[in-house]
Amino acid sequence: MKRVFDDYDYERIYDKQLDLSTGELLEEVVRPQRGVAYTTATIKSGNQFEVEIYPSFRHQIPDMIRRHKEKKRESRECQKNLNDRHAKKKLFRLIHENFYPGDYWCTFTFADDPKDLETAEKLCKNFFRRINRVRKKKGLENAKYVYIIEESERLHLHLVMDNGLSKQEVESKWGLGFSHIQTLNYYKDENFIGICEYMMKEKKDIRLKGKKRWGSSKGNLVLPKPSKNRTKLSKKKVMDMVLNQDSIGERLEREYPNYNFKEVEIRYNDWNGLFYIYARMQSKKWNRAFKRP
């Protein structure tokens, strides 16, 4: 089997969003390329199914990509956008893979506003330790959770957590301010899309340089891994999808008949005329009453 080179940060390379409102753009962007194919990576998280289609190379990663990786540091805004895209995908996958209807969607505030993000993180981690001590006494494993510390007028904590303890038990272990716990559920035939979007919405914050805005429990969450197929879609099929975006949903539903198409985004790079396609689909067979195993 011929070796294929597709191990690179394609989201960094294909960073311009494609707008097909005019045909002139495609004429400027598309360039014929030899030695190029497309890898299809799929990621299943709960009832969500992501499809990522990106260029692979039959000989080696082109010099232009290596130079792009080695060139001077990206602008702060470009790097922030890339980091945000990676973070959103990881959070999306963790939540959909590890949480179920009946789990908890929580908001906690601080009566005494922490002086900085680092202090807030320490207080939150102490809260998780208190939760786990109660669970241990009950013979339960450590809590599963994904959280984000957010600043609007004041710092506060948003949290998705499993329902091993009652809402009253969880609230009693916060003790630092107001608490509001809702039962996690689906909304309008989606899974937890709204929760993910809310947690990762754009907002001014006081993140320290290099710090994540969100975190999760350690050692008990499953992060779905991509499954690669290097022959699923030919270059011709990919270009047809780019040129006929209205047909992408129908085409993907033929390729993956157990899923309904939901949304797509196409990005490109203007120096090599190649494309990256991201699509989200949702299982047709997902049972709303499905509970934690």
PLM segments and residue spans:
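Right-hand nucleic-acid polymerase module
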Residues: M1-E153, N163-P293
